[in-house]
């Protein structure tokens, strides 16, 4: 297969993994687009994206326009004369003129099995909804949000032990493999594009810190899914004794209870059992303010009086 001249567009670590795969391949990365440097850390120092750092380290020209809607930026991109543009978590909208500039157009690697979970947080929403599988879709981009024709799909079972952090790692390994397969198929003309079924489409809304508050009026199953979805960010939490307590790990208990949602049923080194609207949730790993995450046994050693049976935990619905 003849090497393709590729423009890569991406910003976070997830994107950098894909850029690295392209750099390791026989293709030519002729330019990299990434978002402008942003203030980060306590000193708010301007910081380059992981994609920029990787590109600079490999002596690849880097472009950081604030927008691709203006003609000078579009002309600059066209002058690269690329065969294809690969887009992974770039964060900027590509207007139609840009989508049509490379010879083979623009393709995107998306962290879900489209058309399910279009949008910003597909990995987290798959866990949040209790999906049994996820995967990666490589699509030909159009002007819609993750609406383009699908070129290649891979699947991955979601394990009970998975969190957003672990799924992210799995998809960050799966995505680059799918990307290289798709590029080979495009170059050889052997890929058949598949339209997305709009009837099956839904959107993965961005996560918010407010959404991470545990609502004991939900079922234990739903709360278990949310804790996994919101790990490592924004991290599920509840308010108790005037403190915000983060929850990193839970499981659905086999215990049954008729107690009001938010009531502590039992507290031992095996876990703190809390009644919900449907079932009992066992808290296994938590984080007190200013402390690191700890197993419940250590939490009870430090603050056992906070979690006595029959204590009612704060609930936003109270």
From Swiss-Prot:
GO terms for cellular component: cytosol. (6S)-5,6,7,8-tetrahydrofolate binds at residues 112-115. The keyword Amino-acid biosynthesis does not apply. Disulfide bonds: none annotated. Belongs to the Fmt family. Its EC number is 2.1.2.9. This is Methionyl-tRNA formyltransferase. Attaches a formyl group to the free amino group of methionyl-tRNA(fMet). The formyl group appears to play a dual role in the initiator identity of N-formylmethionyl-tRNA by promoting its recognition by IF2 and preventing the misappropriation of this tRNA by the elongation apparatus. Keywords: Protein biosynthesis, Transferase. PROSITE patterns: GART. It catalyses: L-methionyl-tRNA(fMet) + (6R)-10-formyltetrahydrofolate = N-formyl-L-methionyl-tRNA(fMet) + (6S)-5,6,7,8-tetrahydrofolate + H(+). InterPro entries: Fmt, Formyl_trans_C, Formyl_trans_C_sf, Formyl_transf_N, Formyl_transf_N_sf, Formyl_transferase-like_C_sf, GART_AS, Met-tRNA-FMT_C. It comes from the Bacteria. Coiled coil: none annotated. It holds the Pfam family Formyl_trans_N. GO terms for molecular function: methionyl-tRNA formyltransferase activity.
């Amino acid at each position: 297969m003849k090497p393709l001249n590729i423009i890569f567009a991406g910003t976070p670590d997830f994107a950098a993994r894909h850029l690295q795969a392209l750099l390791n391949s026989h293709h030519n990365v002729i330019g990299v687009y990434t978002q402008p440097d942003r203030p980060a850390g306590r000193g708010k120092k301007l910081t380059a994206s992981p994609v920029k750092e990787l590109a600079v380290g490999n002596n690849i020209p880097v472009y950081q326009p604030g927008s691709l809607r203006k003609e000078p930026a579009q002309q600059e991109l066209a002058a690269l004369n690329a065969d294809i543009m690969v887009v992974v978590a770039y964060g900027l909208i590509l207007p139609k003129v840009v989508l049509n500039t490379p010879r083979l157009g623009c393709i995107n690697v998306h962290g879900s099995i489209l058309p399910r979970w279009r949008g910003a947080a597909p990995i987290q929403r798959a866990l949040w909804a209790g999906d049994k599988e996820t995967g990666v879709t490589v699509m030909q981009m159009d002007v819609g949000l993750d609406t383009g024709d699908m070129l290649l799909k891979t699947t991955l079972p979601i394990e009970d032990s998975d969190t957003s952090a672990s799924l992210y790692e799995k998809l960050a390994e799966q995505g680059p493999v799918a990307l290289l397969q798709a590029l080979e198929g495009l170059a050889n003309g052997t890929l058949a594009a598949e339209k997305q079924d709009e009837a099956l489409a839904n959107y993965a809304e961005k996560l918010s810190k407010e959404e991470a508050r545990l609502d004991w009026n939900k079922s234990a199953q739903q709360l278990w899914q949310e804790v996994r979805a919101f790990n490592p960010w924004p991290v599920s939490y509840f308010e108790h004794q005037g403190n915000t307590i983060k929850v990193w790990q839970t499981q659905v208990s086999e215990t049954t209870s008729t107690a009001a949602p938010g009531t502590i049923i039992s507290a031992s080194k095996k876990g703190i059992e809390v009644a919900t609207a449907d079932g009992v949730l066992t808290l296994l790993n938590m984080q007190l303010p200013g402390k690191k995450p700890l197993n419940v046994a250590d939490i009870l050693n430090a603050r056992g009086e906070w979690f006595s049976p029959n204590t009612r935990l704060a609930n936003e619905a109270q």
